[in-house]
Amino acid sequence: YIFYSFLSLIILASCKTNKDYLSRSDNDNTLFDAIKTLKKHNTDTTALQALPVLYNLAQQRNLRKINSYSSSRELSRWDKMINAYSTVQEMYNAIVENDAASRVVTPVNYQQTLYDLKHEAAADYYTAATVFLNKPGRADAKQAYNYFKKADKLVPGYEDAKLKMDEAY
């Protein structure tokens, strides 16, 4: 008797209905979950209906974050903005790679914006690194090294960042 109860519970758990995508709080992950569902079942009506709403919510939330970060003067704002733009670009990529998803959502491509933002960030990190490099002391040299490294990571081969890293080291 216990065996049948346990078996019934397992069967019910494995046959659960589609998640209500719109009731979940993490729009970014929920959007990717809906796309994953569409990869398996391209006619899943729950995912197809939720996807445009999820994309709009996630896109708007990330753009609000970007707007908020852009008013900051801290160097870390670049990392936060790049992360948010990377998220919406990943959404774009996931949607255009899925026929069912791309039929119900026309996502925005942020690739050029992300490229430009990385160049702006690299310039800011490079400038800050130069300021630290011109100061005496090991701690400032370390900070200069880290900022030159960051500039080169954002834009590989950025100006003479690698040479300056050697100089700071």
Q: Where in the sequence are the language-model features?
A:
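Conserved small-residue packing positions in alpha-helical repeats and bundles
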Residues: N18-L22, I35, Q59, I66-Y69, ...
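Post-signal peptide N-terminal segment of secreted/secretory-pathway proteins
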Residues: D44-G137
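Bacterial Sec signal peptide processing site at the extreme N-terminus
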Residues: L9-D33
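Sec-dependent N-terminal signal peptides
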Residues: I2-I10
